[in-house]
């Protein structure tokens, strides 16, 4: 039995239907905003890194998305020069996953990320909640809670960071409308996973 074959009703999430989801593979053109409701979209884009130690590092980025509810990004690069300290070629990667529940926890999103890039590594997670005191009327509020961990810094490939590991938890709040845009943040290091100790309010 096929119900609503022309997709006339407001079923905002077709992923849980018995009919198998279709998909579309396309090049990630600049400014592209292709978000169909009845397809999983895969967008790809070639990538190229360069630094003095790794030389060129060709790769590819692949984005997987379903409307505004699910977004994943996979990014990989392979260095053509061997690392003299490891005697092998370095493999660099990035991963991002953003998920919004549809049938519960309205206006809430979950984000997970991780990367190993020339000079820096990081993993992290975040929960975001958007709300307003009067439904869909300003001022709007955005609350975020999250963490990130940077286990080490390779100072041979970047001079933007001091050596050492870093672990941080944070809370963020934003309130905005057409006339104001106010951001605040409370963050703190996490011992013993951080070589720095601090508490910060901005």
Language-model segments: what does each one mean?
Residues 94, 115-117:
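Compositionally biased, intrinsically disordered low-complexity regions enriched
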Residues 111, 176-202:
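Extended beta-strand-rich architecture
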Residues 46, 74-78, 110-114, 142-151, ...:
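Membrane-embedded beta-strand positions of outer-membrane beta-barrel proteins
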Residues 120:
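Extracellular interaction modules
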Residues 4-105, 124-139, 144, 155-178:
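Outer-membrane beta-barrel initiation region
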